[in-house]
UniProtKB/Swiss-Prot annotation:
Belongs to the TET family. JBP1 subfamily. Its EC number is 1.14.11.6. Dioxygenase that catalyzes the first step of DNA base J (beta-d-glucosyl-HOMedU) biosynthesis by converting thymine to 5-hydroxymethyluracil (HOMedU). DNA base J is a hypermodified thymidine residue found in the genome of kinetoplastid parasites, which is localized primarily to repetitive DNA, namely the telomeres, and is implicated in the regulation of antigenic variation. Also specifically binds to base J-containing DNA (J-DNA). Keywords: Dioxygenase, DNA-binding, Iron, Metal-binding, Nucleus, Oxidoreductase. It catalyses: thymine + 2-oxoglutarate + O2 = 5-hydroxymethyluracil + succinate + CO2. Pfam families: DB_JBP1 (PF18526), Tet_JBP (PF12851). InterPro entries: 2OGFeDO_JBP1/TET_oxygenase_dom, DB_JBP1, DB_JBP1_sf. This is Thymine dioxygenase JBP1. Fe cation binds at residues 189, 191, 239. GO terms for biological process: base J metabolic process. 2-oxoglutarate binds at residue 255. GO terms for molecular function: DNA binding; metal ion binding; thymine dioxygenase activity. It comes from Crithidia fasciculata.
Length: 811
């Protein structure tokens, strides 16, 4: 009972409050300081976004990471996320990786606690200790990830498996520890405590979000991850998350990830000494039942706790082909083209994509003051306390997350049955009266969204009675007669969030009807002696309330007296040899689940251990351009509204020297270039409406063809037809109408950009391809056109047309 009570107490009484929130100046200084050591990297800093399963390699062919899409069974991620979501709590320990703010993060499994004020080292984490009976819910997830790791990186898995002490394994795997992150955009960092001889794994186990790709900062490669995806990677490379992609600050999203690793300090001599000390004590205790009779020490390798050496890569769109599992059949030919593209001053990129792969004087990047703080979603707003608790964003966000702890299932393990029954009945009574009042209000005004609180109504009386019960619940959780002001503020914020959620979810009221602010005002009434209307009540009612309050207090005191006689276990002082007491078998067959080893074999079937070499065979490439509507060059002198051409955003876009070169250059598709050979690569050119007949190509490049097709259905049909002529990868080259920094910008600035961007890119398309009114689309709109799997995106750096190359597998 104590572990659950301790967890509730920690979560309710230990989180940011208005008094604890630093000033705006202090937060700004902390943000700047954090970024010096751990900068954030946005999408604009990367060149490649890898969407599909792939093996990423560095400049010497060493594996950076292996990405596998939808590789985890849904039952495993669902079961694990249901338990592990509670492990991610506000912690200042990782604030340096979150711009100085406390992110939602936590650890589970076993941990060394080296350098920590925790006295007892090398043991179960508090989370696993307190959730030992439920801990097996994570075993299927851990088993599947381990077998996938073993399949794709067998030598590293074996080294890790040989080094990890058996008593700190999670369900027999080579993982000792899990790190759980919720809504946490990490700044650039390495995982210094992970075992040097192995790899770590990360899985997204729950979420509904866009963006937040895992980026390998030194390689300029992003890996967007979604639920059930797994990445086996060298965590000693610097990595971070790109920006969250939301359209407005109120947009709902969630993201829960889990990192699996062997914490190498658990295999050092000091940890083995701790294991043996505990085991010796257990063997002298007749009541103890250790699961092993001895501790076998293993070689732990040499762990330097330093970043891995970086051997840079010079990616091109064709090099990406060689990394993608789905395109392995054309990888060797892709590398042949890549090697020609990588030659300094090679004209091949312009022939294929219409421009160079990189441009140093393209559209200028944004100033820092034009961008949102990288941790904006987790940062707290200024405190505007107006009642029983602070209304800072940090407090309200945390309170909503913890409101579940006032449900019956949680409280039943923390307070007496008598006090719990009072809480349940008082809450039910108040909700019943709220429902009655709300039904009456919407009967006369169906569109109503605000709840009119009547201060002398039975509902108001029931609310204050519920507050009296809640106050005793709070004191029962604290095990004392009075709470500090800070403890009260913390509890009342959770209490209000709990009632707000109950009204929204159970009574189906609009979110704003029973708002947190409204409840806060009423809690202020309660804090002023119970209610400011008490003196106006009849004497009999006043006496009834006093007696009711006394009975609730007595129920809580009886609960406290009963608990004083119970033996309690405390994680901080737990010195037992309780390693592996949580372990048990998983009945995969009984549940009808795939056996992890066989499942891993299936989901890794397309993974190839050896790096591919470039072929010497002939490579056929077709470049398709939009046919110009006439033989005349596109007219740049098109009349545009003055409010567009004089806007700050238009002036900024037009200030680029690269943009001015596009406007002055010859139209790219007035005539077709003659077919030619560049070493082993045969280049063929065609207009979009006169493709070669009865010919097939290894690669086809559609150069801004879809922007000449305003109808989405026509564009999709055109892409579908490419299957008949392309045997390898289809490259779709298009403008992304949203700039690369779009989702980092302050929202008003996005509106200003949106007002001019379509006209700006239409102007460039008229000059470059003669397209009268190009249909420039957003990333999401372009990708929605594809009837095939989009495996990756290659972003031409500094491109004046914001050009992106999409790699499609024509399966």
């Amino acid at each position: 009972m104590e572990p659950k009570s301790k967890k509730v107490k920690q979560d309710i009484f230990n989180f940011p409050d208005g008094k604890d929130v630093p000033t705006t100046k202090e937060k700004a200084e902390a943000y700047v300081d954090a970024l010096k050591a751990h900068p954030f990297y946005d999408n604009v800093h990367s060149v490649v976004d890898v969407y599909d399963s792939a093996t990423l390699r560095d400049g010497k062919g060493r594996v950076i990471g292996v990405m596998l899409r939808k590789a985890l069974p849904e039952h495993a991620t669902t079961a694990a996320s249901g338990l592990l979501s509670a492990a991610a709590v506000r912690t200042s320990l990782r604030s340096s990786m979150f711009g100085g703010e406390s992110p939602l993060s936590g650890i589970a499994g076993y941990f060394d606690y080296r350098g920590s004020p925790v006295e007892l080292k090398a043991r179960k984490t508090a989370f696993t200790y307190e959730h030992e009976k439920k801990w097996p819910a994570v075993f299927p997830l851990v088993d599947y990830v381990s077998e996938i790791y073993k399949s794709v990186m067998p030598e590293h898995w074996a080294a890790q498996d040989s080094a990890i002490p058996d008593i700190v394994r999670i369900h027999g795997t080579p993982f000792s520890t899990l790190t759980i992150n919720s809504r946490f955009r990490t700044a650039s960092h390495t995982d210094a405590g992970d075992f040097d001889g192995g790899y770590s794994c990360i899985a997204c186990i729950d979420g509904d979000f866009k963006g937040l790709a895992l980026g390998f900062d030194d390689f300029h490669v992003n890996v967007p991850m979604q639920p059930r995806d797994v990445l086996v990677f060298d965590s000693h490379y610097f990595h971070s998350n790109s920006e969250l992609e939301i359209s407005c600050p109120t947009e709902e999203w969630r993201r829960l990830t889990c990192v699996f690793y062997y914490r190498s300090a658990l295999g050092e001599p000091s940890s083995y000494a701790e294991y043996r000390r505990r085991l010796a004590a257990a063997q002298q205790d007749s009541t103890a039942q250790p699961v092993v009779s001895s501790v076998v020490e293993k070689p732990n390798g040499k762990n330097l706790y330093k970043p891995s050496t970086v051997f840079p890569i010079d990616p091109t769109p064709f090099a990406v082909v060689a990394q993608l599992h789905r395109l392995h059949h054309c990888a060797a030919k892709g590398l042949c083209v890549h090697e020609l593209l990588a030659v300094p001053s090679s004209p091949l990129a312009v022939l294929l994509f219409g421009e160079r792969l990189s441009c140093s004087d393209g559209i200028p990047l944004r100033a820092a003051e034009q961008k949102l703080k990288a941790n904006a979603d987790g940062a707290s707003r200024g405190v505007t306390s107006s009642g029983g608790f602070s209304e800072s964003d940090a407090v309200l966000t945390t309170a909503v997350e913890k409101s579940k702890y006032l449900e019956r299932d949680h409280l039943s393990q923390c307070i007496s049955a008598e006090l719990l029954a009072m809480w349940v009945e008082a809450r039910k009574h108040w909700l019943r009266l709220v429902a009655t009042e709300w039904a009456r209000m919407i009967a006369t005004a169906p569109e109503r969204t605000d709840f009119l609180w009547k201060n002398k109504s039975p509902m108001n009386t029931a609310f204050f009675d519920l507050c009296e019960v809640a106050k005793q619940v709070m004191l029962g959780l604290l095990d004392k007669e009075t709470a500090t002001p800070t403890e009260e503020r913390h509890f009342w914020s959770v209490y209000a969030a709990h009632l707000h959620r109950a009204c929204a979810e159970r009574l189906m009221m609009p979110e704003e009807a029973m708002s947190l602010r409204k409840l806060n005002v009423k809690l202020k009434d309660f804090s002023f002696g119970g209610t400011r209307y008490f003196k106006d009540m009849p004497v009999e009612e006043q006496e009834r309330r006093v007696a009711r309050k006394a009975s609730i207090e007595e129920a809580r005191r009886r609960s406290t007296a009963a608990k004083d006689g119970e033996q309690r276990s405390n994680w901080l002082t737990n010195d037992a040899f309780d390693y592996q007491t949580e372990d048990c078998e998983v009945d995969y067959a009984g549940h009808g689940w795939a056996v992890p080893k066989q499942h891993a074999k299936t989901v890794t079937a397309n993974v190839h251990q050896e790096a591919v070499a470039a072929t010497t065979e002939a490579v056929r490439v077709l470049v398709v351009l939009p046919r110009p509507p006439s033989g005349d060059r596109g007219d740049a002198a098109v009349d545009l509204p003055k409010e567009v051409t004089t806007s700050a955003e238009w002036v900024r876009l037009m200030s680029s020297p690269a943009v001015r070169r596009v406007l002055a250059a010859k139209q790219r598709n007035l005539t077709l270039l003659p077919n030619c050979n560049v070493e082993a690569v045969s280049l063929n050119f065609a207009y979009h409406d006169s493709l070669p007949q009865k010919a097939t190509f290894d690669f086809v490049v559609l150069q801004h063809v879809l922007s000449a097709m305003p109808e989405d259905a026509i564009a999709t049909d055109y892409v579908s037809r490419m299957r008949s002529i392309c045997t390898g990868c289809l490259f779709v080259v298009e403008t992304d109408v949203q700039c690369r920094q779009y989702f980092t910008l302050h929202y008003p600035l996005r509106v200003q950009y949106d007002a001019v961007a379509p006209a700006f890119f239409q102007l460039l398309h008229r000059c470059s391809y003669g397209t009268p009114l190009a249909r420039t689309r957003t990333k999401a709109e372009v990708e929605a056109l594809f009837p095939f799997v989009c495996c990756a995106r290659y972003k031409l750096q500094g491109s004046p047309m914001n050009t992106v190359v999409h790699l499609l597998a024509l399966e």
